[in-house]
């Protein structure tokens, strides 16, 4: 090592000076060496600016700053000398230049980082001097300013604790001779607890909780080794170092986090980082001398690894303010790869090797193992360059991890097992075989080219390739017939010489690369060849110059059968290829022709055109020259699609790479569609062998062997001369020969081969595969035997007579199998034995286990010996990499610790200790822990009980605005402010740094709240802070006037006031209200408020003489100002126990109410009927009236229409005056009783467990959202009108109520939302200037700032209820009408999320959108049955009122986490959701405050309830499992063990038998009851039990489960619901007969699902008993059957339109139009024409025109003169025409308003225009009838026209009867 070139005397001085360290040396002896003048001179020499950097030591900017400061440099050198003296185990002597330039510089440069800068160095120095000299270093202010750091204020005890831990751990690890992980961790735990007890006794109880962690760390080592499997058996040392390093580092970070939360540490300073960069590095240096080869490089590498670990671990526990570090093994490995990239670039370039950049590594590596493999490869190259030796372990590891050889071997083993179980390979399995084969060949090539790979690994790969090739040969010629996926077909079409063939070949190559397939996976098909010679189920089939020549059959005709999902046997030339079926996955075609040839003999051109999934029309760009090296450079690709009878251009692509991306995307979409289409068929499909009998197999063998000398007859026994050879295969050193005749008689013997071994081997393979295929696909083999094929094909289980001598399972199980085994025929056993020998099946071992066992010991011996000689730094670095990929158990616990926040365990210790001068009691560090374990409800006395002679106004203010905030033993007074905010004392709340679960106690109610310190807003020049959160209960906005917001204007200098406080009496257990008369002075001078280190100064305050006591802070000062009592100040401090000080109210901004609704309310002085969830707060002002339904719309039908069916349902009670109300329930009010369901919300849930459950659900959402990229808000137009053609984006219902307060402006005939929109009924928009439009704009502008004040109307639901809910105990359900603008904004923010949930119902629990008529019901049943036969069918009590704000806040966070977006959008989502849980409800003339539940009129009610339902079940599942100490793996396996589906409050829970001892109905019922949730049996609501039921006994959505076949389940509706439809009909929008007929059709359809026989009998009864219904009015059974067949092909929700389309006779005719131009409109007569608004702008009408707008939403007041808006109700079965009554009144009647306007216009020489949107047929008919009625058209013309109409559509058959005037002159 060279030295700086300085004066010779200085260099000589340094070379002679040494420093010596001995074990156990005293501090004085060390100081004697480092305090000499010579040593100080050496330090000055080291600090000289001209000094040259020594090789291997990097002097960063921070290091240079240390060298420039003599004091810091000397102190740090001495501190390092102290540190080294602790680490030596034997006497060591260093030259001073070596000590300074190498050891000290290396250590300090690692200690000083860019992130923490000098903090660790200063702490390190403090610790060393504190430990060795009991002296505390105080850094001078100028030094701190020079280093730009803040002084640390760490207690001595904590400093010593941390120092002891840092120095002890590596020392102990270094001294552990046997490297026992258990010994290291056990000792570490004991030492840790000892240090805590000695130095920080107050923290001992926290550490006792932490000590539970060490019990698990030992398990992580074993689990990691098991995870990595056979390969790491020989490198346990490496895994020990890796896991121990990560685990201890995490433990220390957790300790530090706890100490910070407890207030022992002011801020974190990276204890784990110090441990890694000092302890681990020092321990790794032991016995690795400084003169060793590569010492500097090794230590730099280890430091690099330590820095990466520290970044991940510290970043997990202490994330940055802006960048939240993602702590995971992926981040660790990516960081390590990036650091090694920079580190290795210079060291490896000399040998011609460079490391891949980290971004390239991340791109190329598809998984964690691949990334680790790349890193180990770099490490291998580094060792070769640095130390000069080759390591086979790293060479093997880089290959095994980089290529995931272990996963490759397991996949091969799985494929072989599947082949044994089925005797064939499916389409997907064949694809997997080819992918694995190509990967194996690539690994073989890579291993041989790189060198250094162990022979055992190479042989293992070769064995896998050989067995894959055998499996490929076996499966590629199979003829098993079954369902297959339709191939994805691409047609490259274009003119000749455009490069189509080249393009097709290149696309094929890119597809092969994408799927990892080799070049032999393509079959080039010549349509002229009648045979498919050489076809081996290749994934790709190419057809070049398709249809270029005429063939028979034609090329187009051949495509019909190829591009299908039906099995298609091919015509093969070779006998051995007989029966192969086509099942390639891709068919690529190049052709010059776009259309089908007339000579193709294809009867349906559409069938051919629909089989071309993508048409790529290839052309050349004339502006670009052809480039032979890049033929695609001048190509243009036009993507065509055949749709609606023509070719449509989808897009035009000019770049080849974009084309490939497009084709791959379409390919993936096609595959997903096929999987969905065939999912059920794949499960239930039976596959047929093309061999009808075993004789056919034997005949095939005879034909194969004909002409070849395969078998030598002389070697056959005499009795077997007439038999055929089945096989002759080698086994255990001899051959097993099996012969069989046509009667299946078998002769077997062991001996020599009976023919040519090589040829006979191929012959035997084909015969065995054919025979095995026939055996498994036939019914000959017992199904019990087929279920145990893995054991039955094992040759070790047979003796030489082929008798089965093995054992299946345990003895008791095997005994049950004996009869089945005995029933097997000998030819069965011969085939099973032979296939087992052929496939190398070994006893009780998979193929994977056999192969691994063959190499395991050899690798263990080799790796153990090699790793033993590695330098320790390499061991530690490599161990960290292995732990990152193998330590899954550690990482799981680590993520749980990181993700838990500070948790409730830390909540009570968050505040810290401070002075008692401000009169708030200091938070107790253990308050939250005490609360957590002693959660006993506190008794209290309400304020009205206190003996007070105070003015009632002051009491009312206290009741509305004062509250207490409670956590643990801390009880604070706060002031509630409108807008979900409160004011509180700054000196207390500034010390709360972590989230807390607190309780808010107000007058008459209390609730829990998750306090988040991030929502505290500092108020300058005030001792108050403002806290705001959406989940706080709001106080009435009328309370705003109860505060004095402008003290300068309103307050005099001296005034009288009331001092009011309400503190908790600990001894009495109640809140005690007190008051005092005070004289208040307004002070305008500085007041200093101190609390320990806390100091705050305010320039203005209120002062009064009052003997205030502790905990008075937060008390109210109320004065009579401006004619009313107001809060003028909040008590914040006291002076010497005599003078009180209050802070003036800050100038807050009021939060506007979007609805401005409270102007209609008269608020009560105090709330009434108070409960946990609701309270009556006001009444409606005089004259304010809310119109609600008072009479039912349900009409009872005549008795003969009841069809002798029972009915126990009647219309519900809507008004208190209903005479049906029983006498004992007199006074029952349905509107007010409806709000009572919100009176008792559920109890608060444990936030940690709730967060864990939310993360589980959120993870499922993210899994479903991989391909879902649209979660943004939709436009207002889309929120109103929906999106045409987009699933689950329907328009907003306009017929429903507009909500409060807009409902108050209704006129007599107006109703619903229609009056606030305008448009043509297809596309509408808000009418500007209306109350809804204004409220919408206000809500949009403010939703992100605060929770809107929501007012709903509770409206009794007009429905049929059981008689007991009317006559016995009235119980009418209510639904909530919410304001229109609120619903619109919610739809904008959440519509895409709702679409996502509904579209993924097949994967999620929420089943909103399910179609019970489709196969969805069958899939739901299969999903339940998959978990087992134990199903809980549950029913909640008052579910609508259970949801708490705590859970709603969590749901809002989940949705925001999934949907993302800007902060403004996230805040708006949260506020809109939270408004539901804290709103006002109008119940007739009273107003109630509701603080829980979901209003039924909320657009997302059913979605949110479904999510809440799922959270409840998941929460109590984990709670119950952990309470019973179930294995954690089961706790975390909800989705594996439980099948859950929800739909609002409806659910089904299928429970796996494994967890029934822990989780059943009884335990679930009890657990829910503890939280205030009542759940009962859904089938028997009176039962006290919640038993398991079979799925067939359960119901869901009032539908049961009836299994029709192995795959089809029906969902018949409860008959009681059906019969009630015959007794009562809703006549709101139609005549009674029409409504009844609609119900009859629905009942008929539902009865068909019960059974076709019942439907037939019901149909006949209807026709017999209801005389006016004809057979043509009812669908036939054939139509019903077709309806269900159609529905089972659908995936979307059912709707009435679909039902009408398939069951209504009137709609089965062809569509009607007068002419092709009729859809644009037509000329009816000279005076009357019709126009389609899609093509005509009525606003541009002429002065000589009169316009009628039919069924649009344009208000009449907004239309120009001469325009008239007409709306009708469509009649059922009338082809779109209005009801009979409407037509009679408006068309047939001559003096109707419409006819008058027409006649007036005609007399004025004006033209009349009838306008509508899209469907013009009804308007055309109305126009024609109007023309003939007003004598503008001859009757002969109208007669002929209408007759033609009726011929085309049966729906209009009623026209002659109703409009006789149009058919004859009357």
Swiss-Prot record:
Give residue ranges for domain SF3 helicase: 462-633
| Residue span(s) of domain Peptidase C3 | 945-1150
**Catalytic activity annotation:** RNA(n) + a ribonucleoside 5'-triphosphate = RNA(n+1) + diphosphate
Residues bearing O-(5'-phospho-RNA)-serine are 920
Q: Which GO terms describe its biological process?
A: DNA-templated transcription; proteolysis; viral RNA genome replication
Q: Catalytic positions?
A: 987, 1023, 1113
Q: Which SUPFAM superfamilies match?
A: DNA/RNA polymerases (SSF56672), Trypsin-like serine proteases (SSF50494)
Q: Name one GO molecular function term.
A: RNA helicase activity
Please indicate which superkingdom the organism of origin belongs to. Viruses
Domain named RdRp catalytic: residues: 1429-1559
Transmembrane regions listed in the UniProt entry: 897-917
> Gene Ontology cellular component?
host cell endoplasmic reticulum; host cell membrane; host cell perinuclear region of cytoplasm; membrane
**What does the annotation give as the result of altering residue 545 to P?**
Complete loss of viral replication; no effect on polyprotein processing
> PROSITE patterns recorded for this chain?
PCV_3C_PRO, RDRP_SSRNA_POS, SF3_HELICASE_2
Q: What is its EC number?
A: 3.6.4.-, 3.4.22.-, 2.7.7.48
Name recorded for this polypeptide? RNA1 polyprotein
Q: What does the record give as the organism's lineage?
A: Viruses, Riboviria, Orthornavirae, Pisuviricota, Pisoniviricetes
């Amino acid at each position: 090592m060279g030295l700086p070139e300085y004066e010779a005397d200085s260099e000589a001085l340094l070379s002679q000076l040494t420093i010596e360290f001995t074990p156990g040396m005293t501090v004085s002896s060390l100081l004697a060496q480092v305090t000499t003048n010579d040593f100080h001179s050496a330090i000055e020499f080291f600090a000289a600016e001209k000094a040259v950097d020594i090789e291997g030591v990097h002097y960063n900017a921070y290091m240079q700053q240390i060298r420039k400061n003599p004091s810091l440099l000397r102190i740090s050198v001495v501190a390092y000398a102290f540190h080294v003296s602790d680490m030596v185990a034997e006497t060591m002597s260093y030259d001073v230049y070596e000590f300074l330039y190498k050891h000290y510089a290396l250590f300090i440069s690692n200690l000083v980082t860019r992130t923490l800068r000098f903090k660790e160095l200063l702490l390190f120095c403090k610790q060393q001097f504190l430990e060795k000299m009991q002296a505390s270093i105080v850094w001078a202010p100028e030094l701190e300013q020079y280093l730009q750091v803040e002084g640390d204020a760490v207690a001595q005890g904590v400093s010593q604790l941390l120092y002891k831990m840092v120095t002890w751990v590596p020392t102990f690890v270094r001294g552990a001779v046997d490297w026992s992980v258990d010994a290291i961790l056990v000792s570490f735990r004991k030492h840790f607890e000892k240090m805590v007890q000695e130095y920080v006794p107050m923290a001992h109880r926290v550490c006792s909780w932490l000590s539970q962690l060490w019990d698990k760390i030992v398990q992580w080592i074993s689990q990691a080794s098991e995870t990595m499997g056979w390969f790491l058996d020989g490198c346990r040392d490496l895994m020990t170092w890796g896991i121990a390093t990560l685990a201890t580092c995490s433990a220390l970070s957790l300790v530090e986090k706890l100490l910070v939360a407890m207030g022992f540490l002011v801020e974190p300073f990276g204890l784990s980082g110090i441990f890694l960069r000092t302890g681990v590095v020092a321990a790794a240096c032991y016995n690795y001398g400084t003169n060793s080869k590569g010492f500097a490089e090794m230590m730099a590498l280890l430091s690099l690894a330590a820095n990466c670990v520290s970044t991940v671990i510290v970043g997990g526990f202490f994330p940055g303010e802006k960048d939240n570090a993602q702590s995971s093994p992926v981040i660790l490995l990516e960081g390590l790869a990036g650091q090694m990239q920079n580190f290795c670039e210079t060291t490896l370039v000399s040998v011609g090797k460079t490391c891949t950049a980290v971004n390239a590594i991340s791109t190329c590596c598809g998984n964690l193992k691949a990334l680790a493999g790349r890193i180990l490869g770099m490490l291998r190259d580094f060792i070769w360059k640095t130390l000069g030796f080759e390591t086979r372990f790293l060479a093997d590891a880089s290959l095994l991890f980089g290529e995931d050889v272990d996963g490759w071997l397991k996949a091969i083993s799985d494929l072989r097992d599947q082949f044994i179980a089925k005797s064939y390979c499916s389409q997907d399995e064949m694809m997997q075989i080819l992918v694995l084969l190509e990967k194996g060949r690539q690994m073989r090539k890579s291993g041989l080219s790189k060198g250094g790979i162990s022979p055992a690994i190479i042989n293992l790969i070769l064995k896998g390739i050989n067995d894959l090739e055998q499996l490929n040969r076996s499966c590629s010629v199979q003829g098993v017939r079954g369902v297959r996926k339709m191939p994805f077909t691409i047609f490259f079409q274009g003119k000749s010489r455009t490069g189509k063939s080249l393009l097709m070949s290149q696309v094929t190559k890119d597809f092969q690369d994408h799927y990892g397939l080799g070049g032999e996976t393509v079959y080039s098909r010549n349509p002229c060849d009648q045979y498919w010679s050489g076809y081996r189920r290749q994934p790709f089939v190419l057809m070049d110059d398709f249809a270029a020549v005429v063939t028979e059959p034609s090329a187009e005709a051949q495509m019909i059968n190829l591009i299908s999902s039906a099995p298609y046997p091919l015509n093969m030339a070779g006998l051995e290829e007989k029966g192969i079926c086509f099942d390639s996955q891709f068919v690529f075609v190049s052709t010059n022709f776009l259309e089908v040839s007339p000579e193709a003999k294809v009867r349906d051109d559409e069938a051919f055109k629909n089989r071309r999934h993508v048409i790529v029309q290839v052309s050349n760009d004339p502006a670009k020259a052809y480039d032979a090296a890049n033929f695609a450079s001048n190509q243009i690709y036009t993507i065509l699609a055949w749709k609606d009878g023509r070719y449509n251009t989808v897009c035009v692509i000019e770049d080849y790479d974009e084309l490939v991306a497009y084709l791959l995307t379409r390919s993936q979409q096609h595959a997903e569609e096929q999987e969905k289409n065939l999912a059920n068929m794949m499960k239930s499909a039976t596959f047929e062998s093309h061999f009808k009998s075993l004789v056919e197999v034997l005949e095939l063998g005879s034909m194969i062997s004909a002409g070849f000398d395969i078998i030598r007859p002389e070697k056959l026994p005499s009795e077997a001369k007439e038999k055929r050879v089945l096989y002759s295969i080698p086994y255990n050193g001899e051959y097993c020969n099996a012969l069989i005749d046509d009667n299946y008689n078998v002769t077997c013997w062991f001996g020599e081969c009976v023919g040519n071994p090589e040829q006979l081997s191929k012959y035997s393979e084909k015969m065995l595969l054919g025979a095995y295929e026939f055996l498994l696909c036939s019914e000959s083999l017992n199904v019990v035997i087929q279920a145990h094929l893995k054991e039955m094909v094992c040759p070790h289980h047979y003796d030489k007579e082929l008798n089965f001598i093995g054992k299946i399972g345990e003895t008791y199980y095997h005994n049950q199998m004996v009869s089945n085994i005995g029933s097997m025929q000998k030819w069965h056993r011969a085939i099973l034995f032979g296939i087992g020998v052929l496939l190398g099946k070994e006893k009780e071992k998979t193929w994977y286990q056999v192969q691994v066992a063959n190499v395991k010991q050899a690798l263990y011996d080799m790796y153990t010996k090699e790793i033993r000689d590695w330098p320790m730094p390499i061991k530690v670095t490599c161990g960290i990499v292995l732990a990152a990929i193998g330590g899954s158990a550690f990482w799981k616990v680590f993520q749980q610790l990181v993700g838990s926040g500070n948790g409730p365990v830390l909540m009570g210790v968050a505040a810290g200790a401070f002075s008692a001068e401000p009169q708030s009691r200091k938070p107790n560090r253990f308050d939250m822990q005490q609360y957590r374990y002693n959660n006993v409800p506190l008794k209290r006395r309400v304020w009205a009980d206190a003996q007070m002679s105070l003015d009632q106004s002051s009491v009312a203010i206290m009741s509305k605005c004062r509250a207490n905030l409670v956590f643990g033993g801390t009880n604070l007074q706060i002031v509630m402010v409108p807008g979900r905010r409160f004011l509180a004392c700054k000196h207390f709340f500034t010390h709360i740094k972590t989230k807390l679960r607190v309780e808010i106690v107000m007058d008459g109610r209390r609730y829990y709240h998750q306090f988040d310190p991030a929502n505290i807003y500092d108020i300058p020049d005030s001792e108050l802070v403002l806290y705001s959160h959406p989940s706080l209960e709001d106080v009435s906005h009328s309370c705003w006037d109860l505060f004095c917001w402008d003290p300068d204007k309103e307050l005099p200098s001296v005034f009288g006031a009331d001092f009011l406080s309400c503190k908790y009496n600990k001894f009495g257990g109640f809140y005690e209200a007190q008051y005092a008369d005070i004289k208040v002075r307004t002070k305008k001078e500085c007041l200093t408020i101190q609390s320990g280190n806390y100091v705050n100064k305010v320039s203005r305050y209120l002062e009064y003489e009052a003997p205030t006591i502790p905990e008075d802070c937060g008390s109210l000062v109320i004065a009579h100002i401006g004619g009313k009592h107001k809060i003028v100040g909040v008590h914040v401090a006291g002076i010497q126990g005599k003078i009180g000080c209050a802070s003036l109210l800050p100038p807050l901004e009021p939060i506007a109410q979007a609805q401005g609704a409270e102007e209609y309310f008269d608020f009560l002085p105090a709330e009434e009927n108070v409960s946990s969830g609701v309270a009556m707060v006001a009444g409606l002002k005089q004259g304010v009236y809310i119109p609600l339904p008072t009479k039912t719309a349900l009409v009872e039908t005549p008795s003969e229409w009841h069809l002798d069916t029972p009915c126990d349902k009647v219309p519900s009670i809507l008004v208190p005056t209903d005479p049906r109300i029983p006498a004992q329930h007199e006074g029952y009010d349905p509107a007010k009783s409806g709000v009572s369901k919100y009176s008792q919300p559920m109890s608060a849930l444990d936030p940690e467990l709730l967060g864990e459950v939310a993360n589980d659900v959120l993870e499922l959402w993210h899994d479903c959202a991989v391909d879902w990229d649209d979660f943004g808000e939709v436009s207002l137009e889309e929120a109103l009108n929906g999106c045409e053609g987009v699933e689950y984006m329907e328009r907003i219902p306009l017929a429903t109520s507009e909500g409060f307060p807009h409902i108050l402006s209704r006129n007599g005939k107006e109703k619903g939302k229609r009056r606030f929109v305008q448009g043509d009924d297809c596309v509408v928009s808000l009418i500007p200037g209306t109350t809804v439009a204004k409220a919408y704009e206000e809500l949009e502008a403010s939703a992100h700032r605060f929770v809107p004040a929501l007012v709903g109307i509770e409206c009794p639901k007009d429905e049929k209820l059981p008689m007991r809910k009317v006559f016995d105990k009235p119980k009418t359900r209510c639904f909530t009408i919410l304001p229109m603008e609120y619903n619109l904004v919610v739809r904008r923010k959440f519509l895409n999320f709702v679409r996502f949930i509904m579209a993924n119902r097949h994967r999620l629990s929420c089943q909103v959108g399910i179609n019970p008529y489709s196969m969805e019901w069958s899939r739901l049943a299969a999903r339940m049955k998959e978990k087992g036969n134990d199903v809980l069918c549950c029913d909640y009590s008052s579910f609508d009122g259970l949801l708490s704000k705590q859970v709603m806040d969590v749901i809002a966070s989940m949705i925001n986490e999934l949907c993302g977006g800007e902060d403004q959008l996230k805040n708006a989502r949260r506020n809109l959701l939270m408004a539901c849980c804290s709103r006002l409800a109008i119940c007739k003339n009273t107003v109630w405050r509701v603080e829980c539940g979901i209003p039924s009129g909320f657009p997302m009610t059913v979605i949110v309830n479904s999510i809440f339902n799922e959270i409840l079940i998941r929460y109590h599942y984990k709670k119950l499992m952990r309470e019973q100490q179930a294995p954690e793996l089961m706790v975390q396996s909800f989705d594996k063990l439980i099948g859950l589906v929800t739909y609002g409050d409806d659910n089904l829970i299928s429970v796996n038998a494994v967890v029934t001892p822990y989780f059943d109905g009884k335990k679930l019922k009890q657990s829910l009851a503890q939280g205030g949730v009542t759940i009962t049996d859904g089938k028997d609501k009176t039962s006290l039990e919640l038993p398991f039921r079979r799925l067939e006994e359960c119901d869901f959505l009032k539908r049961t489960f009836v299994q029709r076949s192995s795959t089809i389940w029906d969902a018949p509706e409860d008959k009681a619901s059906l019969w009630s439809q015959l007794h009562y009909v809703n006549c709101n929008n139609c005549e009674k007969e029409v409504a009844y007929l609609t119900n009859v059709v629905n009942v008929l359809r539902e009865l068909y699902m019960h059974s076709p026989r019942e439907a037939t009998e019901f149909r006949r009864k209807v026709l017999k008993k209801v005389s006016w219904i004809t057979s043509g009015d009812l669908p036939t059974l054939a139509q019903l059957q077709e309806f269900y067949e159609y529905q089972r092909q659908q995936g979307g929700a059912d709707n009435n339109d679909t039902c009408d389309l398939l069951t209504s006779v009137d709609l089965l005719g062809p569509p009607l139009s007068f002419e092709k131009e009729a859809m644009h409109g037509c000329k009816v007569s000279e005076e009357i024409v019709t126009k389609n608004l899609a093509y005509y702008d009525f606003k541009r009408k002429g002065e000589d025109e009169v316009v009628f707008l039919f069924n649009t939403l344009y208000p009449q007041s907004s239309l120009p003169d001469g325009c008239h808006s007409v709306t009708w109700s469509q009649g059922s079965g009338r082809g779109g025409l209005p009801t009979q009554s409407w037509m009679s009144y408006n068309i047939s009647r001559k003096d109707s308003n419409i006819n008058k306007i027409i006649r007036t216009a005609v007399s004025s020489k004006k033209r009349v225009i009838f306008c509508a949107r899209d469907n013009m047929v009804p308007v055309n008919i109305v126009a024609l009838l109007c023309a003939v009625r007003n004598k503008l058209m001859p009757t002969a013309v109208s007669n002929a026209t209408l007759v033609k109409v009726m011929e085309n559509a049966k729906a209009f058959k009623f026209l002659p009867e109703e409009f006789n005037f149009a058919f004859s002159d009357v």
